[in-house]
């Protein structure tokens, strides 16, 4: 007996990340190889023709799991009964644009989308914000959807997590799949703090294997934090395939579970680790039965506290910059 189809809403569907994402979702990479999906694609009126072109390609793949596609410029149509919502579309920063202008332009978008989710999405909708500034955009959407549980709103730090894993694997000479107990704290921005103090590789203590605090502070942390900029510099375009891959990892783990492995998600704070309530902040979680659970009780040393507070202060500044727009 085939499972009933899940409705997956994707915003910014005509964009680069969307193009890398949609075919993999339709192929079952995100929700499982036995889970039919209906894609509900949102983009701006001027992007509708481009989205329709992507839909033609989706049709031409004849994916067995693709049970339907909706294309719209209306958030209430895109989010109708959505089980998963990937909020990829956001206003990019243009030349000469101040960060505060970027914040308010995105606050407008994510207020509208939060309200639409509140009105029409499934009450169990799993929301992942990819569009930057992701943590604050997730906070805005959450605050605009008072009838949905706060825990349904998450921001993507999985790209940072995966970037950190790959750097650690290269440095330690261990397979990337063998590294466990990594966490990336804070904001999806260069202030994030990738922390491998308790991480292991093939069961061995990773700090002992690497044994290079100078590398950690002066190479590893800045490399992970500035990787996005390095890709733009090299390619002339921002990272799209790796961002789409991280979004799929994030949702797959949230829905299907992590088998006890730690992953990083940006989630609304419950006050633990000194993070004020509701701030969407990257922490280590494990997932099972469609729910995430933060890893509690990690020891925070002085260096870590400083790094965690630094990224928190940036998030508080962003929150204060949009607070007046949230009614």
UniProtKB/Swiss-Prot annotation:
GO BP, sorted A to Z: malate metabolic process; tricarboxylic acid cycle
GO molecular function: L-malate dehydrogenase (NAD+) activity
UniProt KW keywords: NAD, Oxidoreductase, Tricarboxylic acid cycle
EC number annotated for this UniProt entry: 1.1.1.37
Annotated residues for binding of NAD(+): 12-18, 106, 113, 130-132
Positions annotated as active site in the UniProt record: 188
Catalytic reaction annotation: (S)-malate + NAD(+) = oxaloacetate + NADH + H(+)
InterPro entries (UniProt xref): L-lactate/malate_DH, Lactate/malate_DH_C, Lactate/malate_DH_N, Lactate_DH/Glyco_Ohase_4_C, Malate_DH_type2, NAD(P)-bd_dom_sf
Binding site for substrate: 93, 99, 132, 163
Job of this protein: Catalyzes the reversible oxidation of malate to oxaloacetate.
Identification of the protein by name: Malate dehydrogenase
Higher taxonomy: Bacteria, Pseudomonadati, Pseudomonadota, Betaproteobacteria, Burkholderiales
Gene behind the chain: mdh
